Design a protein with these regions (language model features):
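Active-site helix of classical SDR
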Residues: 123, 157
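Short C-terminal tail/terminal secondary-structure segment
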Residues: 97, 146, 206, 224, ...
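Conserved mid-core segment of classical short-chain dehydrogenase/reductases
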Residues: 70, 93-109, 128, 150-153, ...
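Catalytic Tyr-X3-Lys loop
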Residues: 101-120, 137, 161
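Alpha-helical segment proximal to the catalytic Tyr-Lys
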Residues: 128-129, 170-174, 232
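The beta1-alpha1 cofactor-binding region of Rossmann-like NAD(H)/NADP(H)-dependent oxidoreductases
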Residues: 39-40, 60-72, 105, 217-218
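Conserved glycine-rich Rossmann-like NAD(P)H-binding loop of the short-chain dehydrogenase/reductase
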Residues: 27-44
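Conserved glycine-rich cofactor-binding loop
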Residues: 13-14
Length: 246
């Protein structure tokens, strides 16, 4: 149990982010539940953590805005005095994924703004403000290994995350801070299920050797391992959590 450590989880009002917030709170972390726009859902996560005996606050911040990312850390420190863990879960994936040649500028810019710039902003803050022995955990995707048509731009944003993860781990030499990423496969969240037919969902569920979709708790458990003390020798790595899909 980490009774004195503080974790920021971005994009934590729903889905995988909410599951991570609940899991880290159960492990004893005080959790900063970041959200971009859904205050009601974020409040539900905070209330659920409190009902289970944990500590949490909700902080609105669009992490694609550098000033908002800075304020997120400021409010975490104001509430709890420190930050030990950053989980960069916030990200977007459009329900319709056109081929690269059919992708418009607005879609490209929005994906890179949230998925790359948002994580960059919070990593930059964390690099300067995390405690010795801290953890930065980013989110990639197993789609990088699959190379599926239609995912070129989305996967490119996550490829950038993997590169920054590996290099930042080296740049933080001497601080005792690890930087890793988790790359989920198909996971049963609203983000994943939106716009897909039952047949498509069934086909994707059967693709992995374990013959099911991942769950938010599967990913939250992986995150808990990577930010915990047992993974202190894992650094600069991307762990694929996809049931053996790739």
């Amino acid at each position: 149990m980490n009774t004195s450590q503080v974790a920021i989880v971005t994009g934590a009002s729903r889905g995988i982010g909410a599951a991570i917030a609940h899991r880290l709170a159960a492990d004893g972390y005080a959790v900063v539940v970041n959200y971009a726009g859904n205050a009601q859902e974020a409040a539900k996560v905070v209330d659920g953590i409190a009902a289970a005996g944990g500590r949490a606050i909700a902080v609105q911040a669009d992490v694609a805005d550098p000033a908002a990312a800075r304020r997120l850390f400021d409010e975490a420190v104001q509430a709890y005095g420190r930050v030990d863990v950053l989980v960069n879960n916030a990200g977007i994936m459009p329900p319709a994924l056109p081929h690269l040649a059919d992708t418009d500028d607005q879609t490209f810019d929005r994906l890179f703004s949230v998925n790359v710039k948002g994580s960059f902003n919070t990593m930059r803050e964390a690099a300067a403000r995390l405690q010795t022995g801290g953890r930065i955990l980013n989110f990639s995707t197993s789609v990088i290994g699959l190379g599926l048509p239609g995912y070129a731009v989305y996967a490119a944003t996550k490829g950038a995350i993997e590169v920054m993860t590996n290099i930042l781990a080296k740049e933080l030499r001497g601080k005792g801070i690890t930087v890793n990423a988790v790359a989920p496969g198909p996971t049963a969240t609203a983000l994943f299920l939106d716009g897909k037919s039952p047949e498509t969902i069934e086909r994707m569920a059967k693709a992995a050797p374990l013959e099911r979709l991942g769950t938010p708790d599967d990913i939250a458990n992986t995150v808990a391992l990577l930010v915990g003390p047992q993974a202190g020798w894992v650094n600069g790595q991307t762990l694929r959590a996809n049931g053996g899909l790739v």
